[in-house]
Amino acid sequence: MGRQASLTLDCSLFSGSIADIITAFNQIGWGYQGDIKEYLPLHDDDMFDYRADSISVGELLELINEKQACGELCGVVLYDQDSDRGIHLLAKDTKEITLNLMINRKTICGGFTDISWYIEHIAAGLEETGCIVQSLEYDEFI
């Protein structure tokens, strides 16, 4: 197994809605592969069996709202529209949003994650939209 890296954000001062956080990600250029949205379906019992469907952003956000209301883990795959990088966003609430940096993870020497790229392209971007990032935690497992 290769390296794994994740970034955990607390955006609860901005909103309690995970759908609002996903919308903020969309505003800073993190979106989807064409019309296809990859997400954890409703009542998936934490099986992590992502579904890839041609649904609208509105339909996806409705599903996220339903999952959050049911206390389920919400998950969506987002891609940086200016590169080939992608993340898995996972959250039950906006106090702990985990971003698995696993799709074409940006690296520096020795294969370490270029965390400054992710801070610049995610945390700083979110703050520019008014989404306050109250805390940020980074983990890398070798």
Report the location of each language-model feature.
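Generic alpha-helical propensity signal that fires on short helical segments
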Residues: T23-G29, F48, I115-H121
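Structured domain cores in non-transmembrane regions
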Residues: Q33-Q68
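Short, extreme N-terminal segment that most often corresponds to the first beta-strand
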Residues: M1-D44, E140-I142
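Alpha-helical protein-protein interaction elements
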Residues: I22-A24, A52, G71
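Intrinsic-disorder-associated interaction segments
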Residues: C11-F14, G29, Y50-D53, I108-G111, ...
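Charged interaction segments
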Residues: S54-I142
